[in-house]
């Protein structure tokens, strides 16, 4: 969506995705500056209505990234930008917003407990806002440098928080980049992610390239089977911006149609395995 948005504008992006055959989208505050109070409630409600009128649901949103900085002052400013993004996402009609763990300090064996406690406090501070806005917070696995880099770390944080406002965003590409088998990770996380979301993108294991499935090393059939086996009921959400970024703008419509067809193939495999459970 990022490259398309920069070319078309936000409403035209909804039009393009609807025409290509997508039924849902991620409203990504990672990149778009929609985490301020520049626009009011009416702006976001009308934007959400515009998307749904074209058959595109805002199935999730992204909070701005990173979630923290080395500067305590900058981290506090970012915290309330995340809160603003949560409020805006609720007006759009998004049921959940992905909030990344704090990565202002790289994870090491020596600082793991300190970083765990920092993130625990960070997410706990968001609970009253999630309750106020009626939106869930999806905690994402971020590879290599974060407190959610492995399924075990992610589950520990989620279980310790132990609050219904939280769910899990499982990122397939990040998992592969971490060197963990995504299907095994899905089974390890289990029912914690059943009503969460799944970020779908591929890589070759050496770079977090965020490309389209089947253009990397992820075993997608095993991933779909694992999702079916745990009773997954969430969305499959592309984070494959690198694929569309490599195309000239004139090919965006064709590229989006192809991406939608690949997505429908994955859904078909998921539905097949779901019937076998």
Model-derived features: where do they sit?
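Hydrophobic faces of well-ordered beta-strands that scaffold small-molecule active sites
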Residues: 1, 25-27, 58-63, 97-99, ...
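N-terminal pre-domain/capping segments
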Residues: 1-94, 114, 163, 195, ...
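Active-site beta-loop-alpha junctions enriched in small/polar residues
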Residues: 1-5, 28-30, 63-66, 102-104, ...
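Short, mixed-charge, low-aromatic patches
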Residues: 1-8, 39-41, 79-82, 108-116, ...
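Histidine-acidic metal/acid-base catalytic patches
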Residues: 7-21, 78, 148-170, 174-277
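Active-site acidic/histidine proton-transfer and metal-coordination neighborhood
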Residues: 8-12, 50-53, 70-168, 250
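A short acidic, helix-capping loop that chelates divalent metal ions and anchors anionic groups
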Residues: 31-35, 67-72, 105-110, 177-178, ...
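Catalytic-core regions built around general acid/base machinery
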Residues: 41-54, 122-129, 185, 222-226
């Amino acid at each position: 969506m990022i490259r398309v948005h920069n070319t078309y504008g936000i409403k035209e992006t909804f039009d393009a995705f609807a025409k290509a055959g997508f039924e849902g989208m991620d409203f990504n505050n990672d990149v778009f500056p929609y985490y301020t109070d520049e626009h009011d409630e009416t702006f976001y409600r009308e934007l959400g209505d515009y998307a749904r009128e074209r058959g595109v649901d805002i199935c999730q949103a992204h909070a701005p990234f990173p979630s923290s900085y080395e500067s305590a002052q900058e981290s506090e400013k970012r915290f309330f930008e995340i809160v603003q993004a949560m409020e805006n996402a609720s007006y759009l009609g998004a049921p959940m917003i992905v909030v990344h763990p704090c990565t202002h300090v790289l994870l090491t064996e020596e600082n793991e407990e300190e970083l765990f406690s920092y993130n625990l406090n960070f997410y706990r501070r968001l609970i009253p806002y999630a309750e106020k806005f009626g939106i869930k917070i999806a905690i994402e696995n971020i590879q290599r440098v974060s407190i959610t880099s492995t399924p075990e770390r992610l589950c520990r944080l989620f279980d310790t928080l132990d609050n219904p406002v939280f769910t899990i965003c499982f990122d397939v590409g990040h998992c592969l980049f971490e060197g963990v088998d995504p299907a095994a990770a899905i089974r390890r996380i289990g029912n914690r992610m059943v009503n969460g979301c799944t970020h779908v993108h591929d890589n070759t294991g050496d770079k977090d390239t965020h490309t389209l499935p089947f253009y990397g090393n992820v075993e997608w059939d095993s991933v779909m089977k694992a999702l079916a086996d745990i009773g997954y009921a969430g969305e499959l959400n592309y984070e494959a911006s690198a694929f569309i970024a490599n195309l000239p703008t004139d090919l965006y419509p064709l590229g989006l149609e192809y991406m939608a067809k690949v997505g429908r193939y994955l859904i078909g495999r998921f539905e097949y395995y779901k019937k076998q459970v």
